[in-house]
Each structure stands twice: as structure tokens, then as C-alpha cells.
Amino acid sequence: YPDVVWLDEVLPGQACTTQRIMNAIPDPDKSILVTACDNAVLYDANKFMSLVNDVNNDIIVWSYRNNYTTYYDPEKYSWLELDGDKVTKVNVKEFKGGDPLDQHAIVGTMFFRNKRVYLKSLAGLYERNSTTNGEFYIDNLLNDAIDLGYNVKNFEVEHYICWGTPDDLETYKYWQRFFDQVDWHPYDYKTDYFTN
């Protein structure tokens, strides 16, 4: 894998790690999709591409609602404040109230129009020295992007599947087995990408 970026050290957060990858991308105009590895989503690809194709959108943040992974400990998640589909503020690991099932939590997937948008927002994050739990999160960087005047849009996915904790993974496996055993659901364990 010649394009893999190897790190010899632990960096102080995902925003710093992603910066290393950005530095390895030669084309400053290339769009970038950053995502977490501990979840899956079902989403409308056409709806997402319509947001991507609108060149006025600088950043697209994937979010979800109505998922009980956030209900019992909402302080583990980052939350969007919205004006329509425009992101006006991100509350990182800080829940501002209301019912967590009704609020937009961040999936961990973000589209950046190009690496300049990311790096300029990151510079603001570093300048403010804005960390959460001692780490530089990409979620924090979104507030810098908003302050810089970038157009940050929300993209709500249809369904969020969390594997972030051992309990989340066991819950996922339970539902895999359940849906595989009932006749009325199309799920087939033998053809599931994640089981083969």
C-alpha cells in the first residue's frame, strides 16, 4: 500500500492525525471525506451527492437522530446546532439539553470541499488551542470553519449503526442473528459484507 500514511507516534487528536494525511495529498483542490471506523450508516447517496455537487457547500457533516446509543450518556457525543440544514455551532462532548433522540449527533463523517478548507480551519483550532479531553477533535475544528465563514451543512443519515463500544458491537450482533432468523426480513447473514 504505497499511499498509506504511517505514523511513528501518537498524535494529540484526530485533527492532527488527519493533518498528516492532508499534507500527503498533492492536489489542493481535491475533495476529502474523513470518517470514523467504529460505525456504519444507511444513507441516501443521491441526497448526499446533491450536497456535494453544490459548490457553495464547503463542509458537509453527517449526523443522525433517534438512536439510543446517545440516550444514556449524551456527553460522549458531539451535537449540532442548526438553522435549517446549516450548521451554526458544534457542541463537542457537551449536551445542551432536550431529548437526545431529537437532537443531531455527529456520525464522525465529514466532507471537505478541499484541503485548504480543512487546513485553514485547523489553523484556527490550533490558534485557539481548542481541545476536548486533551485532544484536538475534528468536531472542534467545525466551529473554526463556521467562524471563518465557511458554509457548513448537515446531512442526516437514514440509520446509524454504532460499534464504538463492546456493548454496541454485541447489540449489533444480536440484531444480526435476530433478522437472519425471521422470515419476514430480507437480511441474510451469509451475504452480509461484515460477516464474510
Report each predicted region and the residues it spans:
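Catalytic-core segments of class I nucleotidyltransferases/pyrophosphorylases
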Residues: 86-161, 167-170, 174-190
